[in-house]
Amino acid sequence: MVDRVSATDATVSLINDLKEIHGPLLFHQSGGCCDGSAPMCFARGDFKVGSRDVFLGVINDQPFFMAEDQFSYWEHTHLIIDVVDGRGGMFSVEGPTGKRFLTRSRVFSDEEATFLSKHPARRAKDLDGIEGLKT
């Protein structure tokens, strides 16, 4: 199995803190104008995922999605979600913590790319079993 997204230890720790405050979360990586391409973190019930958004996987048991048009640029890379000092996105729940999520990446190896070509990413509309997910 090849993961499309992973989290650093610092990210896992911040997610744990945020879950205590906000409950179940979700992440969305967009190419939005306001917060650039920063990964945004939302309370799961507060954000409606687009039906064509791409499900990349989970980090610390929280689903991670990307806008379909962005995925066409990033599909050959493994995303590593990290945490750095700074102000989070305007609507992202980590904003008040003095930390922000940051996407790092690496290109998939040939072996990983071959595996993923046989296991395409799913769209949000095709998912079942993610409690509280709105599409």
Regions found by a protein language model. Give the residues of each.
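Domain-level signature for proteins that mediate thiol-based redox and metal-cofactor handling
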Residues: M1-T135
